[in-house]
UniProtKB/Swiss-Prot annotation:
<dbReference type="InterPro" id="IPR041525">
    <property type="entry name" value="N/Namide_PRibTrfase"/>
</dbReference>
<keyword id="KW-0597">Phosphoprotein</keyword>
<comment type="function">
    <text>Catalyzes the first step in the biosynthesis of NAD from nicotinic acid, the ATP-dependent synthesis of beta-nicotinate D-ribonucleotide from nicotinate and 5-phospho-D-ribose 1-phosphate. Helps prevent cellular oxidative stress via its role in NAD biosynthesis.</text>
</comment>
<dbReference type="GO" id="GO:0046872">
    <property type="term" value="F:metal ion binding"/>
</dbReference>
<dbReference type="Pfam" id="PF17956">
    <property type="entry name" value="NAPRTase_C"/>
</dbReference>
<dbReference type="Pfam" id="PF04095">
    <property type="entry name" value="NAPRTase"/>
</dbReference>
<keyword id="KW-0464">Manganese</keyword>
<feature type="binding site">
    <location>
        <position position="331"/>
    </location>
    <ligand>
        <name>nicotinate</name>
    </ligand>
</feature>
<keyword id="KW-0808">Transferase</keyword>
<dbReference type="GO" id="GO:0016757">
    <property type="term" value="F:glycosyltransferase activity"/>
</dbReference>
<protein>
    <recommendedName>
        <fullName>Nicotinate phosphoribosyltransferase 1</fullName>
        <ecNumber>6.3.4.21</ecNumber>
    </recommendedName>
</protein>
<comment type="pathway">
    <text>Cofactor biosynthesis; NAD(+) biosynthesis; nicotinate D-ribonucleotide from nicotinate: step 1/1.</text>
</comment>
<dbReference type="GO" id="GO:0004516">
    <property type="term" value="F:nicotinate phosphoribosyltransferase activity"/>
</dbReference>
<comment type="similarity">
    <text>Belongs to the NAPRTase family.</text>
</comment>
<keyword id="KW-0662">Pyridine nucleotide biosynthesis</keyword>
<dbReference type="InterPro" id="IPR006405">
    <property type="entry name" value="Nic_PRibTrfase_pncB"/>
</dbReference>
<keyword id="KW-0328">Glycosyltransferase</keyword>
Length: 559
């Protein structure tokens, strides 16, 4: 396959597609056996045979019954810029002792101008066995896409699903912040996690690089180190703060804060809760407020939450309020989050009531500290006053499940359907080039995803259709769809001038994810014993699967 202009420079129908986010995503991001197979195909004269591969997964992650599809954009960027440099070809030559120079010339001419990719829209809710991507093209080239595609989709879909599950358990009203950069598996793990957690429903990230690359909102304040770095109020040299409207100036903000702290101590509702607060902590809070008067949010558990952190924060927040600013809130990073958040809210509300400060009780309470799906669920059951959750380690590392397990299987070559058999029926592939549809019921929920042969007529609204389990003959049902949606759309058509789907902004992918999850039937979404979503094949495809299965399986002989 010769290099075409649109494959070489990432153009398709006049559009230029940038390369992958990570520059390490090159054709060498591959398993060696992809190159050994390419050489063997080439030696056998099979390298240009037209093949069809499906990329799919076999089981939903985290014990759930749904998955979020992510990573498609990076795959298309990889395709659009696919080519091997001379240096890379030299390395392949050295890695394949005895390979002919003509094979290196063949590699030098490769691009993806003869590849077609059909995919489900990124950000969609997807299910096992259904192809996420269908890749068509010369078999040797398609095999060189297998490892990069799996690498780009497996983690992206896994962490997006993890984020979606955290969003589901937290609820729509809570702010979810991804704090995982320091615990992620390397730089790319951190960047990818930030991107796909946002897609999966998180609101913001602490990762500045991800904010720059993808336009994700950034959130962050300070650490315990900032608080403990201060020793006394004497360290604050510049005590001046102009009012928010710029009309007046407070020449001694420290004095104003101390006055506010005394007011809190004398408040009828709060007497006896605290006495002397930690003055070095107060110095840290004042210093931070002077730097960020419009967005003051403090970490309050460095010393003691209720006896020091909260009174000190409230004193600074009241002082800011007198100058026309509104503090944002606090963060809790340790302790009993349900109890502490409730007590903090009571403290805020007492000040609002006693000192007549409007909306003081509505300030944000953020919780962090090794949170995960289970702990957020437990907090909900206990009752809490947390408005925002900062989640890191368990989210970005996908601690509950290490991998999604997407696979890349040949389903057709030279127009001949192929099947992969196994003693484990879950690993038997579904052969031939297929079309996939989502059928919706009367209540608007999706009922079933059905795969059909490429040339079968599509399901029609209002017409009764038999849906069969691919491998279990007793599992079957008639469906009368009220709406039919074809899932696989063309995202890459090589050197053809025909239309294809555009790559969408990350925010639109996020919106799709949120909307589709809202439209799922509740029993598919619940954490405990969710109902499996039905994935079926047409009656005609079912018959063909089992015909091919019997045809390819060797017949045993008993003696």
């Amino acid at each position: 396959m010769e290099k075409k202009e649109n494959g070489l420079d990432g153009k398709q129908s006049g559009r230029v597609i940038n390369g992958p986010t990570n520059p390490m995503v090159t054709p060498l991001l591959n398993d060696l056996y992809q190159f050994t197979m390419a050489y063997a195909y080439w030696k056998a004269g099979k390298q240009s045979e037209r093949s069809v591969f499906d990329l799919y997964f076999r089981k939903n992650p985290f014990g759930g019954e749904y998955t979020i599809f992510a990573g498609l954009e990076e795959c298309i960027k990889f395709l659009a810029n696919f080519n091997l440099t001379d240096e890379e070809i030299d390395f392949v030559r050295d890695s394949l002792p005895g390979c002919e120079e003509a094979f290196c010339d063949y590699l030098r001419g490769l691009d993806c101008s003869d590849i077609e990719v059909y995919a489900i829209s990124e950000g969609s809710v997807v299910f096992p066995k259904v192809p996420l991507l269908r890749i068509e093209g010369p078999v040797a080239v398609v095999q060189l896409l297998e490892t990069p595609f799996l690498n780009l989709i497996n983690y992206a879909s896994l962490v997006a699903t993890n984020a979606a599950r955290h969003r589901f358990v937290a609820g729509k009203s809570k702010l979810l912040l991804e704090f995982g950069a320091r615990r992620a598996q390397g730089p790319d793990g951190a960047i990818s996690a930030s991107k796909y957690c946002y897609l999966g429903g998180f609101d913001a990230t602490s990762n500045v690089a991800a904010g720059k690359l993808f336009g994700i909102p950034l959130r962050g304040t300070h650490s315990h180190a900032f608080v403990s770095s201060f020793m006394s109020l004497d360290e604050i040299v510049d005590k001046v703060l102009r009012s928010s409207d710029g009309k007046s100036t407070c020449k001694d903000f420290i004095c104003l804060v101390q006055t506010c702290l005394t007011k809190i101590q004398n408040s009828s509702s709060l007497q006896g809760i605290f006495s002397e607060t930690n003055q070095s902590e107060l110095a840290a809070f004042i210093s931070y407020a002077l730097a960020f008067p419009n967005s003051f949010l403090a970490l309050v558990d460095t010393y003691d939450v209720m006896k020091s952190g909260i009174p000190n924060f409230c004193a600074v927040a009241l002082a800011l309020n007198e100058l026309g600013y509104k503090a944002v809130g606090i963060r809790l990073d340790s302790g009993d989050l349900a109890y502490l958040s409730t007590e903090v809210r009571k403290f805020f509300c007492a000040i609002e009531r006693d000192l007549k400060v409007p909306d003081f009780g509505k300030m944000i309470v953020t919780a962090s500290n090794d949170l995960n799906e289970e702990t957020v669920d437990a907090l909900n059951k206990q009752g809490h006053e947390v408005d925002a959750f900062g989640i890191g380690t368990n989210l970005v590392t996908c601690y509950a499940q290490a991998a999604l397990g997407c696979v890349f299987k040949l389903v057709e070559i030279n127009n001949q359907p192929r099947i992969k058999l196994s003693e484990d029926v879950t690993k038997v592939s579904i052969p031939c080039k297929k079309r996939t549809y989502r059928l919706f019921g009367k209540e608007g929920y999706p009922l079933v995803d059905i795969m059909t042969g490429e040339n079968e007529p599509p399901p029609k609204v209002g017409e009764r259709l038999l849906c069969r389990h691919p491998f279990n003959e007793s599992k079957r049902a008639y469906v009368v769809p009220q709406r039919v949606e074809e899932l696989l759309k063309c995202y890459w058509r090589g050197n053809a001038d025909e239309a294809r789907e555009e790559l969408e902004p990350l925010k639109e992918l996020r919106n799709r994810c949120i909307k589709q999850l809202e439209n799922m039937r509740p029993d598919h979404m619940r954490r405990l014993n969710p109902t499996p979503y039905k994935v079926s094949v047409s009656a005609k495809l079912y018959d063909f699967i089992h015909f091919l299965w019997l045809n390819e399986a060797p017949v045993g002989e008993l003696h």
